[in-house]
Amino acid sequence: MVVKIRRAGNICRLFEEDLSQYRGEYEDCVDYLPEILFLLAELLRSESLEEVDRLKVAAALGYSVSPLDMFPEEIYGPYSFLGDLFVSLTVLRDVVDAIGLNTVENLWRGEVRLFDLLEDCYNRVSKELGAKKKLFLKHVGLDLIG
């Protein structure tokens, strides 16, 4: 089953506008969130993605656009994007484990090597969120999916 994603570019542009205001320690990671979300949308179109991983990708995309955020932007400002980034990177790491880095990198449109971005940003954001990581995964429902 191939899912058609028609508005992935529009969603990414909205994030790019919001993220242009972000300044902080994780700016270099947060700047890649639109490309990461675009990659997740492209992965939904991939025939090599198993059903359980497709659910994870859909959950990450849904969380990123949902107003029901654990760290609402209205309260936490740009810091709220760390949650979106953590959930997206967690799912991407699972997908890379499932279908291989080369398959995922073929869909990547970012300017840096995907593996380097995944490792560096995942580790830094994970450290910042600490014990809240499990709460994010539970909030999104990823604790229940494979």
From Swiss-Prot:
Key words, A-Z: Plasmid
Name of the molecule in the record: Uncharacterized protein ORF9
Source organism (scientific name): Methanothermobacter thermautotrophicus
Taxonomic lineage: Archaea, Methanobacteriati, Methanobacteriota, Methanomada group, Methanobacteria
